[in-house]
Amino acid sequence: AKGIKSTIKYSSHGYTRQASEPQYLAENVLKREFYADRPNAKRLTDVTEFKYYIGLEVHKLYLSAILDLFDRRIVSCVIRDRNDNALVFQTFEKAVAETPDAHPLFHSDRGFQYTNRVFHTKLERAGMTQSMSRVGKCIDNGPMEGFWGILKRERYYGRRFTSREELVKMI
């Protein structure tokens, strides 16, 4: 039929880059309770990777986002060329600036950015409780992982991006 486009699900080869020596670890306070009865009660966060090509050269972009479990909207997101602490800190600071009175349960995986002492201090100063997925249990951050999957299936997989600008525009 005209205008109908099929998408296929690609297998994931992603992984969380764990901190070799985490400075701070939190319990899984969220415990897969993905229902929130009000905005800003529970938030999830993660970073995902995208690739684009200039000639034969592969380049990467990283998208950090924070999702509100109440309505599954993205509260804050930042795109950068490096997956580093600055990416996550900027995403977090942007969310706090937009909703300074929010004090949600804040859940992430155990990636190196989230186990950083500086990040934990930022959460404490914002009046948020930190929660982390258990080791090797990406389902503990299921709605966030699901968001990435939908975004990539509908907008990214099956396409070849040939410039940074084209990829950023898609995101």
Question: What kind of region is each of these model predictions?
Answer:
Residues 1-171:
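Charged DNA-binding/catalytic regions of mobile-element recombinases
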